[in-house]
């Protein structure tokens, strides 16, 4: 059986292989016989270590001779365990021995961090670093486009840029993506900056229009308030005039119960007033002895002879409404009834 051990991650020049050779050695202890397993280790090196082999050959032969003397007869020769690498490093301290001892280290980390920092980074770490840098640049660009986070930077435009943007806003208050990119290229700006400028301009326009509408509504409200007060004063005056009129004249067919409307003026019909005056004069000059003589009263004759003011002109609507249907009271009511209205006795009765 052959066992090969490879210690460390040593580069090219040194490679140590150990080939153990198990050997059974009988030992006599009392009446029992025991078997002892001895591993023989053989160290092989390359041509670069020939100088070390010559230095340690004499020491190996001396050690083998001592073992042969102490070993009982009949035993098989066993190669001694020898580690010439450690011996050479302890005695000579040459550069080759240091390299050999370094080959047995199993992935040991260097003591200082300078060596690790000096080594080139792996491709994965470089890719991660570049990705982080791209993300940071993108976030910075987004913050700048959006106006920044805590400290917002105001966009400074020249007079030419401002005038051109104002003219474009008068033509179109909103922009399509193509128009936005064209404006950005023409004014040497980013499309996001043009879009933000148009948004702010629309907001300012809407705010100004709201202020104008508010002022107009305030003026309208004040004007309506003054008009309402004036109308209330007129209504109060008209109600006072109506009360005065109804107290001076008798009620005319319940017109005093009607509500007073704005701008309405109540007038008394002249023909009705004249008829009332004539009737009063006739009642005052009436006497029973006048009828006894068979003559008509002078007052009535004079009243009949005096033409009414509206005789030469067609009667008005109010005169036709009130004068034609005025009831007649007195002893002369039978004389004015037409004879055709009297009921004649029938011939059959």
UniProtKB/Swiss-Prot annotation:
Its main location: nucleus. Keywords: DNA-binding, Homeobox, Nucleus, Transcription, Transcription regulation. Residues 150-209 bind DNA. PROSITE patterns: HOMEOBOX_1, HOMEOBOX_2. Residues 42-186 are annotated as: Disordered. Residues 89-99, 121-135 have a biased composition (Polar residues). It is found in: Nucleus. One of its GO terms (molecular function) is sequence-specific DNA binding. Belongs to the HD-ZIP homeobox family. Class II subfamily. PANTHER family: HOMEOBOX-LEUCINE ZIPPER PROTEIN HAT14 (PTHR45714), HOMEOBOX-LEUCINE ZIPPER PROTEIN HOX7 (PTHR45714:SF21). Probable transcription factor that binds to the DNA sequence 5'-CAAT[GC]ATTG-3'. This is Homeobox-leucine zipper protein HOX7. It comes from Oryza sativa subsp. japonica (Rice). The gene is HOX7.
């Amino acid at each position: 059986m052959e066992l090969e051990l490879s210690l460390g991650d040593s580069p090219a020049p040194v490679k140590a292989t150990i080939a153990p050779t198990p050997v059974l050695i009988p030992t006599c202890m009392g009446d029992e016989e025991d078997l002892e397993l001895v591993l023989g280790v053989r160290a092989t090196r390359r041509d670069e270590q020939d100088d070390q082999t010559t230095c340690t050959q004499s020491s190996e032969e001396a050690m083998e001779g001592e073992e042969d003397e102490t070993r009982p007869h009949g035993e098989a020769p066993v190669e001694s365990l020898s580690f010439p690498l450690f011996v050479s490093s302890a005695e000579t301290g040459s550069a080759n021995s240091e390299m050999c001892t370094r080959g047995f280290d199993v992935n040991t980390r260097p003591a200082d961090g300078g060596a690790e920092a000096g080594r080139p980074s792996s491709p994965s770490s470089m890719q991660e670093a570049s990705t982080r840098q791209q993300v940071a640049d993108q976030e910075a660009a987004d913050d700048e486009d959006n106006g920044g986070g805590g400290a917002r930077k105001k966009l400074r435009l020249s007079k030419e840029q401002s005038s051109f943007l104002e003219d474009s806003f008068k033509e179109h208050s909103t922009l399509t993506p193509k128009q936005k990119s064209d404006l950005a290229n023409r004014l040497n700006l980013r499309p996001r900056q043009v879009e933000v400028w148009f948004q702010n301009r629309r907001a300012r326009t809407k705010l100004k229009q709201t202020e104008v509408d508010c002022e107009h509504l305030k003026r309208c409200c004040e004007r309506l308030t003054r008009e309402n007060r004036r109308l209330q004063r007129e209504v109060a005056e008209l109600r006072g005039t109506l009360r005065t009129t109804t107290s001076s004249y008798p009620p005319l067919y319940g017109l005093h119960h009607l509500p007073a409307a704005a701008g309405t003026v109540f007038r008394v019909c002249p023909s009705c007033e004249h008829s009332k005056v004539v009737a009063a004069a006739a009642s005052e000059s009436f006497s029973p002895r006048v009828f006894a003589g068979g003559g008509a009263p002078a007052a009535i004759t004079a009243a009949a002879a005096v033409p009414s003011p509206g005789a030469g002109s067609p009667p008005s609507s109010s005169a036709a409404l009130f004068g034609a249907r005025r009831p007649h009271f007195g002893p002369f009511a039978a004389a004015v009834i037409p004879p055709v209205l009297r009921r004649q006795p029938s011939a059959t009765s």
